[in-house]
Amino acid sequence: MDTIGLDETTTIEINNNSNNKHSSYSSSSSNNNSNNLIISKIPNKIIDSNNNKNNNNNKNNNNNNNKNNYYNINKSSKMDMDYLLDCVQKTHGLIKDLTDSMLISNDQEERKQFQKQLNESNNYLNELLSKLSYIKNNNNINNNNNNGNINSNNGTSFGEIKSIPLMSNETGFTNNKITNNFNYSENKNNNNNNNNGQEQHELFSTSNKIENNNNNNNNKINNENNNEKNKNNNNGQHIIPKIYISDHEMAPNSEFQNIDSISPSSQLICGESRLTPVSERNELTSPASSLPSLPSLPSSMPKENKENKEPINQQEEEEEEEEEDEQKKEEENNLVKMTTVQVENTQEKIPLAKSATISTTNKTIEIEEQEKGMDSEKLKKTIKSSSSSSSNLFNDFPKPFIPFVQSNYNTEERNEVLQIVKLIHYEYGVQIKDKTGQLDNYMYNINFNPPPQYMCNSNDINSNNINSNINNNNNNMSNNLKKKLLIISNEKRNKMGPQIQRSPEETYLSNHFDEEELSNYFSHSFMSPKIVKSPSSSNLNKINQNNQNNNNNNIINNNNNNNNQNNTTTNNKNKSNNEKNNDNNTVFNNNTTTTNNNNNNNNNNSSEKNKVIVFEKKEPGQFIFKKEKVAKLSTSLSYSNLSSSSSNGGTAEDEEYDRYYDSFHCVELVDEDLLVYDNEDIYFNDEVDQNKSPLISPSLSKSNTTTTTTTTTTTTTATYANVNANAIATIGSSRKINNTLSPNMNNNNNNNNNNNNNNNNNNNNNNNNNNNNNNNSNNTSPTLTTQENNGISNGSGNGGRKIHYRSLSHGIIKTPFTNNKLKTLQIFVPTEPYTCRLEITIEENVTVERLLIEVIDLCIKERRKIQYHKRQKLQIQQLQLLQQPIITTTTTVAVQSNNNNNSSNNNNNNNNNNNNNMTSPINQSQSLTSSTTSSNISSSSSSNAFSPPTVSVSNQLISNNKNGNDFESLTFPFLIYTNHRDFILKKSDENGEIDQTLQPIIRTTEIKKLKTDCFSLVINPKAIRDTTHHPQIFRVHIIHSSNNINSNSNNNNNNNNNNNNNNNNNNNNYNNNNNNNCNNGIVKSISFSNIGEVDQSSSSIAPSSSTTAATAATSSTTKDSVAVVYKSSSTLASIKASICKKENLELNLCVFMTMSNEVIQNEKITLVELNLPSVKLVYDQIKPIQKSITPFQSEGVVGNAPRPITKLLGPIFFFTPDNICEIKQYVVSKIGKLGVKKDRYMEISKDKIMYSQFDYLPSSSVSQNGFHNNNNNNNKEYYGGGVGGGGGFTNYNNFSNANLNNNNNNSNFGNGNGNGGINGNNGNNSGSNNKENGGTGAGIGGGGGLQLPNNNNNNNTTPLKNNKFFRSFSSAVIKTPYQLINDISGVGIIINKPNSFYLKCNNKNSEYSSTDADEIVAKIQFIIRLKKENLI
C-alpha cells in the first residue's frame, strides 16, 4: 500500500451530502487550521516508550500499530474538554432529576429503579471526570514535548471503530506518515480492563468483518498491555477522540482549570447541548437508558521518546510487509469498493469504511461507500444499533429538558406568571441550607437550563464556585431569572415521552392558573400556614346543605329524620367515649384519620378547625391571605390517583365539593378564596372538670397525633375574648360559604345531652336543638391559648400524602427574603362584643407605626370577610325560600308542641339555650316568650338559611349565647377612624388588660426593642369624636342594568315600607320581616363600607317580588347596597369612584339614578345639593348623552380626543368630549360625502379604544324615547307609534339618523309592534325594503308602531380603518359592546402562528391577530397585573 507523506500536498475530493458540492481541503505540516483534513500513514517503525517500565512492550505495541490506522484530525484538545464538560453538566442535571424523583416518589419499586439509574449515572460521571483529568494531564505532557505526538493505541480494540484518536500538539502535525487504510471492525471484545468501564462512542458504525481476525489477534495483546498500563494509570485516564457530532459552533477559546476538583456531588446548572448527534434521535424512554455514550479509549497515551528508539530488524520489516500483502488479498476477496483519491495528478485506490461522518466545527464531510453484495438486513441492523445507542437524554436540543414529562392531556403552554413564581422559589430555595429548604427546592425546582451562551465556563468548574450562578448576590440571581425567562417565553411544551407517574405537586405545577390564583401568586412567600387537617369538613358542608334543603321542603319530617340520625350517632359516640362527648353534633364526626382515633378525648368529633394562611408580600411585614385551587385530590397512598374521590372513610358526597391544595406546604385545604370566621375555643377534655374553665384544651397545648411531629405555626390569627364570659375564639377558618352551623363550636352539657338522647324517640326536634345550639356558660377567667404543635412532619400519616411544614418551634426565624429575624406579637383589638386578639408575625426592625398600619389593614379585611359571609348566606336563603312551598297551619301547631317539649326537657333552661329549630315562621311564638333579645329573635327568624344576628348583641346575650354564629355579630366600631395616626399602641398583659399608668409606645420605636409581646390597640384620645350616635347614612343601591327595569315600580314601595319599619321596635321589626318573607320571599342583606358602622336593623331592604332566583344568583358577586357616611362635602363622583374600586366595577359603565329611574347627569353635585336619602348605582350601562350636547360645541374640537383615537381614525372625525362622563366617553361624528352625519359613542380604557356596536344608545338608558336597538343577529329597529294618529315612516332611507322627537309615548320596546296607547291597534309589520305602512288605530293612542328592516349591515360598526385588533373586540365572540379589561383573565402569544395571540375571557380562549401582537399582549398583561395587585 502506497503512503502519502506530510511533505506532499494532499487533495481529497469528497462529495458533501449537505450541499451536493465538491470542496477541497489542503494542508501542510505547518498548517494548523481546524478545517483541514490531513491523511497520512503511520510509519511501520515506531517505538513506544512511555517510561522505563513499558520498554518490554514496545515490540508488541509496534506490531499492533501496524494493524490499526486512524485519521489525524487537527483539532485542539480543548474541544474534547468542551464536549466532556457538556456531558458532565448534563449528567449532573440527570442525577439531580433522578434524586428529585426518588424523593418525591412514594412507590418502593419506583424508588429502587431511580436508585439504580442514579448509580449508573454516578458511575458515568466518574468516567467523564477521569477522562477530563486524563486530557488535562496529557496536555501538560504534550506541552513539554517538542518532538511531536506519536499516537499509539496500546493494543486497545475500539470495537466497531467508534472513534478516531487524536494526534495533535501545539506545533501542528507530526512528520510521521499514516496509511490510507481504514480498519473498521465489529469486534465485540471490548477492553474489559478499563477502570471506569466506559461505553462505546458511536461516531461511526460499520459491519465490515474483514478486520475481525486481525483485531481478535490484537485483543489478546491489548488486554495484556492494558493490564500493565492500567497499573500505572491510577486515575483511569483516557483520551477522547477528536470527532464532533455537531452543527453548532463550539467555543474556540474555552479553557478549563481545576478539572480534578470536579466531584459527582457538584451542582452544575444543566445547560443546553451544543452538540446535535447526526444519527436520528429516538423518543426518551428512561433516564438511565439515556446516558450519553462515550468511546472506549486506550488506558494510556504514551508520548514519543526519540531517545529510547530502537532500530527495527530487517526480519521484522519483511514480516510486516507479508502481513500487509495478506490483508490486501483479503480485501480484494471481500469486494471492497475502492474510493479514488487524487494525489498530484495520480490516482491511488484507498480502502475506506462503508460510512463515515467527520463533523468539523462549521462543516460536515461525509465519505460513503457501498459494499458490493451488502445484505440490506445487515445494513438495517447496523443503522438501528447505531441510532438506538446514540439516542440519549439530550435529544431535540437546543430545547431545555424539564424534570417532569408533560402529560398528553396538557397541550397548552404553561402560564408565564407561574413560571416566574416557580423560578423565584427555585432561586431562593437553593440558598437555604436546612433540610426543609431542600424539600422546598425539590418541589419548586423547575431546572430550566440557560442557553449555551450562559453556560458556566472553565473558571466556574471547581468546588468553590460550582454554584456561583445561584449563590451570588441578588443581581446575579435576577440575571439568572432573566436568562431562564428567555427560554420560557419561547418554549412550547411538547410531550417528550410516555407518561410517568405524577404526584399532586407535579399536577399542580403543570396546571394553568385561574384568575384568582394569578392574583394570589403575586404575594406568595414562604410563610407557614396554621392548618389543622380534618377530612370531615366537606362532609359537614354537604350535611349542612342537605339540612337546609330538607327543612325548607318539609320541616317536620326532615327534622325528625335528621334528628334520628343525629341521636343515633350521638348515642353511639357517647357510649364509646364513656358518655363524655366533647362535640355536640357527632353526626359530623369522621373517624377515618388516625388523629381522631388517638385523640378521642379532646377533638374526636371536631370538624375542620381554624385555618388561617398568611403569606408575606414582597415588602417585608405586609401580609395577605391566600388559597390555591386545584383539581380534587384523593388521599390514597398513590400519588398518581388524582381522581375526585373522597377522603379516606368519607362519603361519596364529598366529590361534589372542590378541594384546595397548598402546593408549597403540601397541605390539602377545604376552603374557598375568602376566609370565614370560625370558633374552636370550646373543646373539653375528659379530665377537665366541667366547673372549671372550658377554655383549657389539651389539643391546644400538646399534640396527640400519630405523625412524628407537627408544626408550630406563627400566622396572623385573631381570637375573641368575651366581655363577660371571657370566651375566646379564633378568627379564620377554611370553611365553605354554606358551612355556617359550625357544630364543633357548640358546647353541650353532657347531662342534658344524655337526657335528651334517652328521650330521642319522642323529642326529635329537641335533640336536634340540644345537639346544635345548647350552650352552658361557665364564667371563669380565660386562659388565652393558641394551637401549638412542635416539629416537622415529613411522613405519610395524613392519608398517605407527604406533609411538610417549616419548623417555627423556636418562635424566631429568618425570612428567606432578608436576614432580619421575625417576631410573633399578640395585639388586642377593641372589637365588639368580643375583644379580638391578633397574632401577627413581623420583622424585628419594623417600627410600631408600620405595625399599626398592618393591624388596621388586617381588621378591615376581616370585616369585609364577615360581611361577605353574611351576604352569601342571605343570598342562599333567598334562593331557597323562592323554591319552598307555603307552610300550613298544621305544621305550625306540630312544631310548637315540639318546642314546648323542648323547654320542658331542658328543665326550664331556656335562658341558656339559643334555640334554632331550623324554622322561620314557627319560632315567633317561642321567641316572644323567651328572654332572648331582638338579635336572637331575628337570628332564629332566618335560621332556615343559617342567618346571623342582624344587630349588635347585648351583654346579656353575650353571656348566655355562645352559638357558633356569634362571630357574625362581631363589629369593628373603631374602624370609623381609618388613619393609623388615630391609634396608639400600649403594652398589656396576656389577657389584654392595659396598665393605664404606662405611656403609649413611641411610634418610631422598633419592634426588637420592645421587651413584651402583648399589646393593645387604643384609639388616640386626640382623635376621639362624638360617637354617641351613629352618623347619618347615605345609601347607594347597586343594581345591574338588566335588573333595573324589571324592578322599577316595586322597589320604591318596598323601600318606603322598610324605611317605616326601621323606626319600629325590635318586635315590630321582626314581624315586618316575617311579613316580607311571606309576601316577597326575600330579605336582602345590609353591608357596610369602610367608612363607618351602622346598626343593621336601621336599613334593611326588601326587593320586589319580581326578582327571580337567577337575578339573585347573578348579583352574588356584588353588594346589594353600600352605606356611606353622610358628609356635606361628599360628591357623587367620589362615592362612585370608591364603590367601583372596591366592588371591582368599571367606572365608565356606572350611572347614578334616582329611585324613580332618573339619570343624574351631574355627578359633581354634593350630597347636600342632591338632597336625597339614597340613590341607585346602575352598572354595565352607558350614560345617555343629553340632546343639548352636540358634536360641534366649538370650532377647535378637532384633535381634542386622546392620541389613540386621533392616530386611529384621522382628522376626518370630530370628537366632542362628554363632560358628564369625565372625559372618558366620546361622541365621534363622521361627515359623509353628502353631508350626512353619523355618530358613534366611544370610550378610552387603559389606552385601548372600545366602541359601541350601535349608532344609538340602548333603550334602557333612554327609556323616554320610543325606540329600541336590538343587537341580535337580525339587527332590527322597532319604533313606537306616535301620539294621536297612525301612520309611520314612509320612503325613509336614512333611518339610522331618524329624528324621533315625536315618539313620546312609552311603547313596548323589542316586541316588533309597539302598542300605541289605549285601545290602539297593533302596527303592520309587513312591507318591502324601506317603504313601510304604519298601522292605523282608533283611540287615544293612535296607530301602532312599525318595523324598519336594517338593510345596511355596516351602519352599526365603526369603519374598520385597517385595525383588526380593535375590530375583534366588538366581534360576536366577546358578545359585549365594550370589552372590559376586567373580563380578561389571561393573555398570551400563540407560538405557532405569527402575530397572533389569545385572550382568555370566561374560561374560554379567543384567538386574535394583530401586527403588534407582542405590544398588545405586554400592555394587557401589565394591566391585569396592576389590577390583581390592587385587588390584593
UniProtKB/Swiss-Prot annotation:
InterPro entries associated with the record: Prespore_vesicle_assoc
Biased composition regions of type Gly residues, renumbered to the chain: 1311-1320, 1334-1346
Feature: compositional bias, Low complexity: 14-72, 208-225, 284-300, 536-575, 583-607, 691-712, 744-779, 896-944, 1321-1333, 1347-1359
Region (Disordered): 1-72, 208-237, 280-335, 531-607, 690-712, 738-801, 896-950, 1044-1076, 1303-1359
Highest taxon above the source species: Eukaryota
Disulfide cysteine pairs (residue numbers): none
Biased composition (Acidic residues): 315-325
Signal peptide coordinates: none
Protein name: Putative uncharacterized protein DDB_G0267840
Species of provenance: Dictyostelium discoideum (Social amoeba)
